[in-house]
């Protein structure tokens, strides 16, 4: 990753999700950077405009903290709802950043984590379909399945973005930055 492309704290950036075939999948119009390093980007957003590949748009319903890592094949969205914190985890390529946006390839598989800690692997049918349509290499399949296991371990061990302190720290940081 180019040093100049690492987003800085307080900066607002776009997030662009692509599919394996290089086509845009989804764009979040604005996320405020809370931490940006070579390996980790943490951001926050609330009521953010999201544009789908077909041009449809919608607005996120609640504040969220997003977590991206340059070495893991997943990213995590921590959503703050009235009944607790939900996590939506995308199996994806590690992120890259350039002047335009933070970017990653979405590989269909998702894990949804509920406030009680239970979780479900989602979209396995979509993954199989796209793996065949877009010819995901066998190596990618192995990497993604290994990262599903890593992600499940993190969830069960309350590690990384699933740690209670992670939520407290970054939610507070996001509130402070938004006040300025």
Swiss-Prot record:
Binding, Mg(2+) 2: 108, 110, 123, 126
Effect of residue 106 to A: Loss of activity
Known outcome of mutating residue 110 to A: Loss of activity
Residues bound to Mg(2+) 1: 90, 106, 110
InterPro entries: DUF402, FomD-like_sf, Ntdp-like, SA1684
One Pfam family of this chain: DUF402
Active-site residues, record numbering mapped to chain: 26
Reactions that this protein is recorded to catalyse: a ribonucleoside 5'-triphosphate + H2O = a ribonucleoside 5'-diphosphate + phosphate + H(+); a ribonucleoside 5'-diphosphate + H2O = a ribonucleoside 5'-phosphate + phosphate + H(+); GTP + H2O = GDP + phosphate + H(+); ATP + H2O = ADP + phosphate + H(+)
EC number(s) given by UniProt: 3.6.1.15, 3.6.1.6
A molecular function (GO) term: nucleoside diphosphate phosphatase activity
Cofactor dependency: Mg(2+); Mn(2+); Co(2+)
Keywords from the UniProt entry: Hydrolase, Magnesium, Metal-binding
Gene3D superfamilies xref list: FomD-like (2.40.380.10)
Cofactor: binding comment: Activity is highest with Mn(2+), followed by Co(2+) and Mg(2+), but the enzyme probably uses Mg(2+) under physiological conditions. Has low activity with Ca(2+). Cannot use Cu(2+) or Zn(2+) ions.
List of residues binding GTP: 25-26, 45, 88
PANTHER family: PTHR39159, UPF0374 PROTEIN YGAC
Quaternary context: Monomer in solution.
Its biological purpose: Has nucleoside phosphatase activity towards nucleoside triphosphates and nucleoside diphosphates. Can hydrolyze GTP, ATP, GDP and ADP. GTP is the most preferred substrate, with the highest substrate affinity and catalytic efficiency.
UniProt similarity note: Belongs to the Ntdp family.
Name the UniProt record assigns to this protein: Nucleoside triphosphate/diphosphate phosphatase
């Amino acid at each position: 990753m180019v040093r100049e492309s690492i987003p800085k704290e307080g900066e607002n950036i776009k997030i662009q999700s692509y599919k394996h075939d290089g086509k845009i999948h989804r764009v979040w119009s604005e996320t405020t950077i809370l931490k940006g390093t070579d390996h980790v980007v943490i951001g926050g957003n609330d009521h953010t405009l999201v544009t789908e590949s077909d041009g449809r748009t919608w607005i996120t319903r609640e504040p969220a903290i997003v977590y991206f890592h340059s070495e893991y094949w997943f990213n995590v969205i921590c959503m703050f709802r009235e009944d607790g914190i939900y996590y939506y985890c995308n199996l994806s390529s590690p992120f890259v950043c350039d002047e335009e946006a933070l970017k990653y390839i979405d590989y269909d598989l998702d894990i949804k984590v509920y406030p009680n800690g239970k979780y479900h692997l989602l979209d396995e049918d979509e993954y199989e379909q796209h793996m065949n349509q877009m010819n995901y290499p066998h190596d990618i399949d192995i990497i993604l399945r290994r990262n599903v296991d890593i992600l499940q371990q993190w969830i069960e061990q309350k590690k990384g973005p699933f740690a209670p302190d992670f939520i407290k720290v970054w939610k507070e940081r996001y509130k402070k930055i938004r006040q300025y």
